[in-house]
Structures are given as structure tokens and as C-alpha cells.
Amino acid sequence: MTNLSKSKYTTYWQCPKMLWLDVYKRGEKAEPDMSTKMRLEAGTKVGKLAHQLFPNVVDATVTDANGNPDTSAMIARTQQMMANSSNSPKINPRSNSFNSPNSPLVIAEAAFSYNGCYCAVDLLVQTPDGWDIHEVKSSSFPEQDGSPSELKKYAPDIAFQKWVLTQCGVNVTGTHLVCLSAEYVRHGDLDIQQLFVIIDMQNVGVKKPMDLIADEYLKVPINVAKAQKMLTDSQTEPTEDLDRHCEKPYPCLFWDYCSRHLPSPSVFDVYGGSFTSKGDDRFYLDKKLEHYRAGRVSYDDLVDQPLGIIQRMQVERQTHIDAGAIRSFLNTLRYPLYFLDFETMQFAVPEYDDSKPYQQIAFQYSLHVVEAPNTICDKKGHGYLAPSDGSDPRRKLAEDLCAYIPMGACTVVYNDTFEKSRLKEMAEIYPDLHDHLLSIRDGICDLLVPFREGHYYLPAMGGSFSIKSVLPALFPSDPDLDYHNLPGTVHNGGEAMTIFPLIQSMPPAEADAARQSLLEYCNLDTWAMVKVWDKLMHV
């Protein structure tokens, strides 16, 4: 019989083939991206912090000689803790009495096994009649419990735990999701009670409460039996085809393997396709799947199908340059032009005052200034990189920014939503810089516009209008504009976000090299915008 952990169960729930591949063809699995790795690291930190929600926490974790969880020992330890709890006071954990001498027992990593199914409950909280499951996630939700649609993806995980515990004879009296409060703003020391939101998964929603666990709980034994039977056969690969489960609730790392039969490019490379995208010119994922199921998978298969303007250019491999529209865009610019780009980092648990979970914290910016039309600036612009001392970088960055960009300036960015948001956030916490920062924000012009609107399109862009796609399409033979050629360790925003917080713990020589790498990367971001602007000027 194949053992099923809660992670394996939820993988099966999303896609049986994904679980089978994870067990028998793990070498086909893509490496998780930087954001996924950071989310996993954040989950560990958030999980430990959640222990502080309760004063009477005992940890059932036991590790072997290699530092790995000793599941058998953890199960035995959990049983002993629960047996000893029979003498503990029976206080309702939802009565806000945690600081009293009668606080309920809380077992962290409480481990259980039944018929080949294993789970370790993040926090198992004693109640007057049994035990409540508390599953800790590093996601953030509003104080009002979020919405059922946002929370449903956590239900299979919790339902599996409830089923295993119930089969082990535990009376599960409640199931809860413990997550970060999206509304929490740090002021001084962390307020653990305000940092977290505890959501009753059997009573979700304000206007029309829903039990998100009941239906999933009934499916658990059926799914367990099917998953265990499937995993007994290492030779027969499941036949699940491409569908929504390839991206929801989590992107599948076996996509390249499962889509290897598709031509390149394929229908799934056509511009658009987010589950939540809206707009007449978006090529919805549902539409892509409809074409795929009908056998229309290559660009040639799509030529005679109804398409939006951008999709049509992409599928027909058109080069489209609308000189008039580009000129109209350029005429909106006011000189001198200040080309600006921020680098940011984010923390699941706010590190600084006046910040929220996962808020983007600007620690660096780059600036190139073009004084007049038909002129060009030096390749090396002005760069600001905050001190690597662990302090909040935003104040000094905002001061430096205001010193270099005057009020009323025309500031050019690429995808203005990001820079506008950072400027607004800093303006809100620094009253003396408020007007200046908002003036910079109000003067922003978005260089993305002529590409996003389809005024300038080349087949090499592949339907993507990010600067990382536009730049090599416009300058295919310029090694100085190739991010891969940057020296050092920083070649993209994810690496910048990861490396900066680590610099303070690096040896001096390594720290200096990392800072130089950050400066060169960010400088290329704004120099790239200057080159793109110059290309548009010569249309």
C-alpha cells in the first residue's frame, strides 16, 4: 500500500497524473521559480510565528539522525500528549481565554496515520468536546474571512486531515484556516493576534455562510482509494489531458512534459489566457482549451478563427508598426524625460513599520535623463541602492528620488501600475514628501502603451509585451542589452528581490559584489527604456 501524505493527497485532488509523475517521473519536473521558493520559505516562518497565537503549545516534532521527520516517533509522541491532556482544563479555545491559567493544550505538528494515510496537523487545539484542526498558510486574506471562492483551494487539505484524524478516533470539533491578515499594518513590535486571521472553514462568508469542508470530506475516502490504487502501478501513466487543472489552483511543474506533443508555438502561447482576465482583446484560457479540444493547436490552425487584433498579428506572424499612433504617443511626452525603475522586496511578515504582509518595499531605483528630442544620455545613469543594514530603505530612497526628479517632471516607466503604487505608498507614510512624490506619480508616462495597444508589434515578441520580451525583439544583435550577459548574480527582478535582504549577512567582498550586481541590473532596466524610446523616435 502506498503512503499518502496531505501534500500527495492535494496533488492527486488537483490532477491524478501530476501525483503519478511526481512519484515515478520526478526527473520531468521543472524547477520551481523564485517566487515559489520564497513562498515555501515564508510558509516555514509564518508557521512558527502562528505558535505564538496560543500560550500552551507543545511540539510533537521528532527528527531522525539526518534531521528528517521521524513520523513513527511523532505519532507516538502525539498519542502520549493527547492522553496526558485528559487532565487538562476543558476551556473553549474560541473564548479568548488563552492567557489564563486554563488555556487549552495546543499540539504543533500533531501526527496521525491511518491505512497508509499520514498527516501532521499544524496546530491541534483542545476543545471541551474534542480537538480543532488549525491549518496555517502564509497567504493573506481580509479580516472578513475572504470569499469562499478564494478559500476553496485549502478545503481538500483540511478535509483530508479531518478524515485521517476521525478514522484514528479523534473527535474533530472544528476546522480552521490560520492565515495572515491583509489589513494588518505593523507599528512597533509585531502584534501576533492582529497579524493573523483565523477562519472557520465550516462557516465561511459574511452574507451567506458556507461549509467548505463537508463536501470535500465525503470525497476523501474515494480519492484515497483511487490514489493508492493508481500508485500501485508504476508502468501505466494516467491519461489526464491538458485542462484547467494545469494552472489551478497551482501551476503544474510538469507542463513541459505533458504538453510535449504540441507544436511550438501553440494555441497556449497566444496572447492572453488568465483565468481572471477581462476585456474584448483577451484570448481566454477557456477559449484556448476549446480550440485545443477541437484539434486546433498550431497557429496555422487558428488563422480562420475569430481573433482579437493582437492575437491576429501574433498568429499570422505579422510585423505591424503604426507610425501615426506611435507619433501621437511620443507627442504626449514632455522634456526632459526621467526614465525610472524601482526594485523591490516583500516579506510575508512585515519587517518595517507602516508596512503590510507582502507589501512591495522599494530598496533601489535607477534613473536616466534625456534632456531633449533627438538626443541621448549616457549609458550609465544615476542609481540609488539603500544601505544593506536591515533598516527600512524607503525613507532614504524617497528623499534621494525627490532630489533627482523635480515636481512636475515627465517620468517614463514601463508598466506604470507598479511605480505608481510604490510612489503612492511612500507618499502616504512621509507627509513632508507627500506632495513631491505624488507630483512625480501624476507625471508618469507609460512606455508600455504603444506595445500593449498593438501599435508596434514584431513576431519575435511572441505575444508578450514585457520589457524582457520587447527588448530582444527590437535589438536582437546587441549584447549590451542582453540581461543574460550581465556580470554577477542578478539578472532579473526575482534575483534582485532575493539577494538584497541577504547582503547584510555576507562577507564584505561578497556583499560589495552583490551590491554592484544590483546596480548594474537596475541600470540596464532604465537604459533599456531609453533605447526603446529612441527606437520609437526613429519610426
PLM segments and residue spans:
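Flexible loop/turn segments at secondary-structure boundaries
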Residues: 28-30, 141-143, 184-185, 261, ...
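Short His-Asn-centered micro-motif
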Residues: 252, 340-342, 413-416
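Metal-dependent nuclease catalytic cores that hydrolyze phosphodiester bonds in DNA/RNA
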Residues: 1-129, 272-307, 313-319
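Conserved catalytic cores of phosphodiester-cleaving nucleases, focusing on short active-site segments
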Residues: 15, 108, 119-144, 161, ...
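Conserved DEDDh/DEDDy metal-dependent 3′-5′ exonuclease domain
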Residues: 104-114, 118-122, 133-136, 154-224, ...
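A charged, amphipathic alpha-helical module
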Residues: 220-334, 344
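Acidic, Mg2+-coordinating catalytic module of metal-dependent nucleases/exonucleases
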Residues: 183, 188-200, 204-264, 282-288, ...
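Conserved RNase H-like, two-metal-ion catalytic cores of nucleic-acid enzymes
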Residues: 50, 67, 105, 112, ...
